[in-house]
Curated annotation (Swiss-Prot):
Gene source species: Arabidopsis thaliana
PANTHER family: 60S RIBOSOMAL PROTEIN L22 (PTHR10064), LARGE RIBOSOMAL SUBUNIT PROTEIN EL22Z (PTHR10064:SF36)
Positions of disulphide bridges: none
Protein name: Large ribosomal subunit protein eL22y
This protein's GO CC annotations: cytosolic large ribosomal subunit; nucleolus; plastid
Listed InterPro entries: Ribosomal_eL22, Ribosomal_eL22_sf
Encoding gene (name): RPL22C
Length: 124
């Protein structure tokens, strides 16, 4: 009997939240944060349908950060994949990369590739 009560208590879905920090490219005016937000709203699939976020997934924008909050399960790898796809579509994938900025891996950051290191290696 106690088993059923434990299952009912665990029935609550925990929400996950991921943040994409785009401050460096937005400050340099390489990309617009609004276009990334729109891209994510159109492309995130919920229940096999793209663009139908409903109440389960919400996307918010604050200055140069986008926060994706999901009520149920949401893959961090999927968010990284979509961000890379956006960068490729806007021809900035050669200069920017998506990396996890903290240990919990719920904060992604768009950073520039270190081109200075590559130029130093080519000179040798």
């Amino acid at each position: 009997m106690s088993r059923g009560n434990a299952a009912a208590a665990k029935g609550k879905k925990k929400g996950v939240s991921f943040t994409i920090d785009c401050s460096k490219p937005v400050d340099d005016k390489i990309m617009e944060i609004a276009s990334l937000e729109k891209f994510l709203q159109e492309r995130i699939k919920v229940g096999g349908k793209a663009g139908a976020l409903g109440d389960s997934v919400s996307i918010t924008r604050e200055k140069s950060k986008i926060t994706v909050t999901a009520d149920g399960q949401f893959s961090k790898r999927y968010l990284k994949y979509l961000t890379k796809k956006y960068l490729k579509k806007h021809n900035v994938r050669d200069w920017l990369r998506v990396i996890a900025a903290n240990k919990d891996r719920n904060l992604y950051e768009l950073r520039y590739f270190n081109i200075a290191e590559n130029e130093a290696e080519e000179e040798d």
